[in-house]
Amino acid sequence: MAQEKMDLDFEADTSEGATLRRSNSAPLIHVLSDLSQVFEPYPLRTGRTSTAIMSHHSLEEGLDMMNRETTNEREAQAGMQISQSWDESLSLSDSDFDKPEKLYSPKRIDFTPVSPAPSPTRGFGKQCLSPSLQMFVSSSGMPPSPVLNPRHFSRRSQSPVKCIRPSVLGPLKRKGEMEMESQPKRPFQGTTSMLSTNPAQLSDFSSCSDILDGSSISSGLSSDSLATGSAPAESPVACSNSCSPFILMDDLSPK
C-alpha cells in the first residue's frame, strides 16, 4: 500500500484574519507496474538533422554536376571526332596515304606517275586513281592532267565523222537512188560505133548525113517523074544503101 505523507502548515494571515491551510502531497512509488506511464523527454536534434540534409543535398548536387560535366565532355569529344573525320575525308595529303588502310577502303588511292619530270603547274606531279570513284584525282586538288596512263588510255574528243560507225544492214541509200535502182536496166539497142572517134567512121557519118539529104531530094524527084511518066535517073543513094546502117523510106515503100 502506498503511504501518503501529508504536511499541514498553519499560517496566520493578519490581514484578513482567516486561517489558510496548504497541503503538499507526493506519492511514494517504489514499484512500477505495466500500466504506469513513463514520460521521456523528446531529444532535440534539429541541428544534426539540418546538417545531414544539407550534406546530402550538396552530395547530390556534386554528383549532378559531375554527370553534366561528363556528358558535356562526351558530346565535345564526339563533335571533335566528327569534325576530324570530315577533315580527313575531304583533305588529301601524303600523311593520309601513308596510314595502313584496307584494300577496298574508299580512301585507298594508288599513285601512277604521269611522266619522269614533274609538271610545273602541278604540286606533286602525280595523279591518284580512286577505285570507288573510277576516275583520276589530283593529289594537289587541281583537275587532272590530260596525259593519262597508257594502261588507262582513252580518247577524250573524237571527230564526229570518225565516231559514226557503218550500219550492220549496209550503206544507207537516198530516195532518188533507190528509185533509180528499182527500175530495170534496158539494154542499149543502138550501135556503139557512134561513140568512137575514128576519122574513117566520122567520114562515114558525114556521108550518111549527105545520103539522108539526097534521099529527101530523090524522093521529090521520083514523085515528079511519076507525074510526067518518065523513068527517074538512078540515084547515087542506091549504091550506098549496102554500106549505110540506116534503112531509107524508099526501100520500104511498095513498088
Curated annotation (Swiss-Prot):
Modification type Phosphoserine: residues: 25, 33, 50, 58, 115, 119, 145
Full protein name: PABIR family member 2
Region (Disordered): 1-24, 169-196, 219-238
UniProt modified residues of type N-acetylalanine: 2
PANTHER family named in the record: FAMILY WITH SEQUENCE SIMILARITY 122B ISOFORM X1, PABIR FAMILY MEMBER 2
Protein family according to the UniProt entry: Belongs to the FAM122 family.
Keywords tagged on the record: Acetylation, Methylation, Phosphoprotein
UniProt cross-references to InterPro entries, sorted A to Z: PBIR1/2/3
In-chain residues carrying the UniProt-annotated modification Omega-N-methylarginine: 122
Residues that bear Phosphothreonine: 112
Taxonomic source organism: Mus musculus
Positions with biased composition (Basic and acidic residues): 174-184
GO terms assigned for molecular function: protein serine/threonine phosphatase inhibitor activity
Signal sequence coordinates: none
